[in-house]
Amino acid sequence: MSYKRLINCCVLTFFVLTAVAQSGSNSPYTRYGYGQLSDQSFGNSKAMGGIAYGLRNGLQVNAANPASYSAVDSLTFLFDAGMTLQNANFKENGIKTNAKNSTLDYIAMQFRLFEGLGMSAGFLPYSTVGYNMSKSKQIGTDPYGNNIQALESYYGDGGLQQVFVGLGYNVFKNLSVGANISYLYG
């Protein structure tokens, strides 16, 4: 029985490592600006349609509502991670392309510092960039009348990542305040 668990853990680890290595986007629109902005919500709020600001539960990490950090119990340490699998189909001039992407959505932890004071820290992707396009165009003719073609290639991969730390404090019953500090890099 223990060998079966070990094999399952190795297989799952392989999938997670593969997921982190992917760009997460195949959209030509990510060429402009910051790229495609990532969904900043965690699994519990995604399951309820993206709602996050009104959730305050001591058993869930909610970076969108830092005041909710104060609800964590003194004996609780929360660790949360999530990933997304995405399938996209593109069609241009009769050419069909299928792209499968997997991304690490977030890693976060939450714990209680003192009575009424909770803390959370984690990592969230802010945006993703992933495109690989090329086009050929005529740039002139040679002395024999043949067209001269040039191939323009555009490639981009990466995005912005966000590391955050936040505190939430329960001022009095039914009133909590909180704030996050974030650092963007990429």
How should these model regions be labeled?
Residues 1-26:
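Bacterial Sec-dependent N-terminal signal peptides
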Residues 22-186:
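Subset of outer-membrane beta-barrel
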